[in-house]
């Protein structure tokens, strides 16, 4: 079967109508989505282009209506009657004929003619939901309509014979498989049917009574008893669909030869890993390690639910009897329960009867939950079924009023992190084992080398010892020989001495006495010499110790002297620099004074931008003298300085406006400057000159003057708000934008100027400056918004103001919500305060809820670092009935 798209009435194909021929009443084992062909030509519609708007609510249920072409029976039976519906796809409208002269018009998100192709149906109905599922949101696509209007054809057609006839289930899985990675992501499916209020597993027929389990904390619904099959490719999925379809209950009725007797529910579970960077360990002790420190891995779990509802039927038309009658009752009861729940959600009823049917329990996340939901309602053209068609259309209209709160479900993938760390640990263990083995091999090699060296040394030592022994023995023998010869010689001399003993005895005794005296003298001399040497050594030791102490003292003194010299040199350099600066300042002040005295524009002042920055550091000098600008103002006169603002010389004009800006920083000078006409001159500079320096300093001076309430009123009266808005639109320099934003922020703090600020474009100018993105500019913008919101809140409390906030009127709420949790503390603090003040006015509550501000208020009441803001947020949420109702509806813990 094929369905072709229709754009602006152009026909590309046709749909084969459902056959109404009666056949056997047995359960069909073939695919029930086969619909016979032969459709008449589609009706022409106007070329207007007005669609059903979604009111800017991203979570609203999108509803499309699809018309089935006439089948053979209807072509014969209704040949003399016009179709009960007329489609206007360009306008996204449908006209329902109540009779020949009365029609009703309905708008839908999409209107699909009988010629619309399966591809177009998928792209406008299911593809946005599939893309959301790939991004981490839950999604639901559901088909609703009278039996025989093509729900199963639209949703579950396999397209074996004709690829173009593939239904939403097949095309959705193709996109999901194409948008995921088999390495990091996983896809699993469950295929169920709700038959006679019993949940049965189409993939495992023996599992015919599956229980519904609800998480008491989150309210999530799960079916732990269902079969989950992991999908690796498209062919695997097609085989599962064929298996499930053979187990689905179908029967032959008067309205449809293959009428579904159960609600088919295909659940596709997608788990995707969020890729994040990993940073290596930078510790010096682990410089050689292979560890990396991964951030906590995130896993997004999403679920796509495709629901092929059984068709509603009227018993007298379908001819159901016996068991088929009980089936029809069960189908109609579950569809009725679903309609009641949708009515309750659409009307914001405090009670939604979700537990009236297992179908509503399974679909609680699809209507009023966190899933992105698309509903396709299928209708037939026959006027005989005008009542069923009207009921189906009204069901779709009510479903369009349901708004869901979309939410991404993320969790930390500790299992993946554990596996990754285990792999790294295995690598480190293997590397450690390799290093340990290499170390052991090195130790063994060194031991072998040492043993070889020792053996070689022992061998050499033994050889040397043997040689030394031989040498000693030879020397010993020679010594013995010499001693023997000497002994013989002495014996001979002794014998000769005996003969000459008497003569030699006298000589020997006298010689002995002399030698003895000489020896005693030598011993005395030696002893005295030793004593002298001891004295000299002791004296030398004392002198050495004394010299060492003196050397240490000299070294210490030399170091102190060097430090003093270095310090003196630094001080002399600082004195030189200070003297040069003093001379330069004196020279510049004299130049300015002479220039002011003469008042001649030709004598240009050549000073640089550093003069105001030097003088702004201190208002009074150390010795109690006045600051240079105050002294200059007293000596020259404020009026002459203001006259120089209109000088033709650019340098004089720039330095004059800098002097005025520095004077305006002092509260005592602000009133004098305003009285002397300085404010008018500064506004003239903003209006007349495009020099960025002049505009920046002039805006800064105006910002200083805007701190005074009298000056604020004068700024507004002289068109300062419009002028500041124009400057903000033209300027690109962040510092200029910071000055302009600061001036407007100061004006926002005046209760009397609220309406004028809004009408003159001050708020829009403030919001326009966020394009810069500079933190200082954003901080001033946030401060202005906080001041404005505070004044509005005070005026509302006093009964002076009513109606929505002007900030919301100018579209400031999205930016406020976006930066409510900004990393910069000044921006975050001001935005949190602004949100609290906006929330105090009940008329702003609905816009704040739709804009996402409620979540930020809850966060502020719990996490804000400042106690006063935290308590203000908590008090505001507690006192607002609208916020309390929404918090209860969303189930927020507060």
From Swiss-Prot:
Compartments, record wording: Cytoplasm, Cytoskeleton
Positions in coiled-coil regions: 423-588
ARM repeats (start-end): 626-665, 667-707, 709-749, 751-790
Compositional bias (Low complexity): 19-50
Region (Disordered): 1-53, 530-550, 598-623
GO MF, one annotated term: microtubule motor activity
Pfam families: Arm, Kinesin
GO BP field: microtubule-based movement
GO cellular component: cytoplasm; microtubule
Composition bias, Polar residues: 603-623
Motif stretch (D-BOX): 372-380
Domain Kinesin motor stretches: 60-402
Protein keywords: ATP-binding, Coiled coil, Cytoplasm, Cytoskeleton, Microtubule, Motor protein, Nucleotide-binding, Repeat
Tissues expressed in: Expressed in the basal regions and petioles of immature leaves and in the root elongation zone.
Residues engaged in binding ATP: 145-152
Superkingdom of the organism of origin: Eukaryota
Family classification: Belongs to the TRAFAC class myosin-kinesin ATPase superfamily. Kinesin family. Ungrouped subfamily.
Summary of the function given for this chain in its UniProt record: Involved in the control of epidermal-cell morphogenesis in roots and helical growth of roots by promoting microtubule depolymerization and limiting the accumulation of endoplasmic microtubules. Seems to be involved in the control of cell-file rotation (or twisting).
Subunit structure, as described in the record: Interacts (via C-terminus) with NEK5.
Domain remark in the UniProt entry: D-BOX motif functions as a recognition motif for the ubiquitination machinery.
PANTHER family assigned: KINESIN-LIKE PROTEIN (PTHR47970:SF30), KINESIN-LIKE PROTEIN KIF11 (PTHR47970)
Protein name listed in UniProt: Kinesin-like protein KIN-UB
Source organism of the structure: Arabidopsis thaliana
Phylogenetic placement of the source organism: Eukaryota, Viridiplantae, Streptophyta, Embryophyta, Tracheophyta
Primary gene name: KINUB
């Amino acid at each position: 079967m094929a369905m072709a798209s229709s754009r602006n009435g152009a026909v590309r194909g046709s749909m084969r109508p459902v056959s109404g021929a009666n056949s056997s009443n047995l359960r069909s084992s073939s695919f029930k989505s086969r619909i016979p062909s032969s459709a008449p030509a589609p009706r022409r519609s106007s070329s207007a282009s007005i669609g059903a708007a979604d009111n800017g609510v991203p979570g609203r249920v999108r509803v499309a209506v699809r018309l089935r072409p006439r089948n053979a029976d209807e072509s014969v039976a209704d040949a003399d009657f016009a179709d009960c519906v007329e489609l206007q796809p360009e306008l996204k409208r449908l006209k329902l004929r109540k009779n020949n002269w009365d029609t009703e018009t309905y708008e839908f998100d999409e209107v699909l003619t009988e010629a619309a192709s399966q591809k177009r149906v998928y792209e406008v109905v299911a593809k946005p939901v599939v893309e959301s599922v790939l991004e981490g949101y839950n999604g639901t696509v559901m088909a609703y309509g009278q039996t025989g209007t093509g729900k199963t054809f639209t949703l579950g057609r396999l397209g074996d014979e004709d690829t173009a006839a593939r239904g939403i289930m097949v095309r959705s899985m193709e996109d999901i498989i194409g948008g995921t990675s088999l390495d990091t992501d996983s896809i699993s499916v469950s295929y169920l049917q709700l038959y006679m209020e019993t949940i049965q597993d189409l993939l495992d027929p023996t599992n015919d009574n599956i229980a519904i389990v609800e998480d008491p904390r989150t309210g999530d619904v799960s079916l732990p008893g269902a079969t989950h099959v992991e999908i690796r490719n498209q062919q695997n999925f097609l085989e599962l669909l064929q298996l499930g379809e053979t187990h689905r209950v179908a029967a032959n009725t008067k309205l449809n030869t293959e009428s579904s007797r159960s609600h088919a529910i295909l659940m596709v579970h997608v788990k995707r890993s969020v890729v994040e960077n990993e940073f290596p360990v930078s510790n010096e002790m682990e410089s050689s390690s292979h560890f990396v420190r991964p951030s906590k891995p995130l896993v997004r779990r999403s679920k796509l639910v495709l629901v092929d509802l059984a068709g509603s039927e009227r018993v007298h038309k379908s001819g159901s009897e016996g068991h088929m009658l009980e089936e029809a009752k069960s189908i109609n009861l579950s569809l009725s329960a679903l309609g009641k729940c949708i009515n309750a959600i659409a009307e914001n009823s405090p009670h939604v009867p979700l537990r009236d049917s297992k179908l509503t329990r399974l679909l609680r996340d699809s209507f009023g939950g966190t899933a992105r939901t698309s509903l396709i309602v299928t209708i037939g053209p026959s006027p005989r079924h005008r009542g069923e068609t009207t009921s189906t259309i009204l069901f779709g209209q009510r479903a369009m009023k349901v708004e869901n709160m979309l939410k991404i479900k993320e969790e930390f993938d500790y299992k993946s992190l554990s596996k990754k760390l285990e792999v790294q640990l295995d690598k480190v263990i293997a590397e450690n084992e390799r290093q340990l083995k290499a170390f052991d091999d090195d130790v063994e090699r060194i031991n072998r080398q040492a043993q070889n060296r020792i053996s070689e040394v022992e061998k050499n030592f033994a050889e040397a010892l043997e040689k030394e022994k031989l040498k000693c023995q030879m020397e010993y023998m020679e010594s013995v020989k010499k001693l023997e010869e000497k002994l013989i010689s002495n014996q001979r001399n002794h014998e000769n001495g005996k003969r000459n003993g008497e003569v030699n005895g006298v000589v020997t005794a006298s010689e002995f006495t002399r030698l003895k005296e000489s020896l005693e003298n030598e011993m005395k001399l030696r002893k005295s010499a030793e004593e002298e040497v001891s004295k000299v050594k002791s004296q030398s030791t004392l002198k050495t110790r004394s010299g060492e102490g003196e050397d240490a003292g000299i070294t210490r003194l030399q170091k102190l002297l060097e430090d003093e010299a270095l310090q003196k040199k630094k001080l002399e350099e600082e004195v030189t620099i200070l003297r040069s600066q003093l001379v330069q300042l004196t020279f510049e002040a004299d130049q300015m004074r002479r220039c002011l005295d003469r008042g001649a524009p030709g004598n240009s002042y050549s000073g640089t931008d550093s003069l105001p920055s030097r003088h702004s550091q201190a208002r009074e000098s150390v010795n109690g003298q006045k600051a240079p600008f105050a002294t200059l103002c007293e000596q020259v006169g404020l009026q002459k300085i203001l006259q120089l603002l209109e000088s033709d010389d650019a340098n004089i004009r720039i330095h004059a406006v800098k002097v005025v800006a520095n004077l305006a920083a002092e509260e005592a000078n602000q009133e004098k400057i305003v009285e002397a006409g300085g404010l008018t001159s500064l506004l003239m500079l903003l209006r007349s000159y495009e020099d960025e320096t002049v505009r920046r300093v002039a805006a800064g001076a105006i910002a200083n003057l805007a701190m005074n309430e009298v000056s604020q009123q004068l700024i507004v009266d002289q068109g300062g708000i419009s002028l500041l808005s124009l400057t903000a639109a033209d300027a690109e320099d962040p510092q200029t934008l910071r000055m302009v934003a600061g001036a407007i922020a100061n004006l926002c703090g005046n209760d009397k100027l609220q309406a004028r600020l809004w009408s003159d474009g001050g708020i829009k100018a403030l919001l326009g400056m966020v394009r810069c993105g500079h933190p200082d500019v954003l901080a001033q913008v946030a401060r202005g918004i906080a001041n404005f919101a505070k004044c509005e809140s005070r005026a509302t409390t006093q009964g002076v103001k009513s109606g929505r906030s002007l900030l919301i009127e100018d579209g400031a709420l999205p930016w406020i919500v976006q930066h409510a949790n900004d990393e910069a503390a000044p921006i975050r603090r001001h935005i949190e305060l602004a949100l609290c003040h906006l929330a105090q006015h009940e008329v702003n509550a609905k816009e704040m809820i739709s804009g996402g501000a409620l979540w930020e208020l809850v966060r502020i009441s719990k996490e804000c670092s400042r106690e006063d803001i935290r308590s203000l947020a908590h008090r505001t949420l507690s006192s607002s009935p609208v916020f309390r109702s929404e918090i209860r509806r969303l189930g927020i813990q507060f």
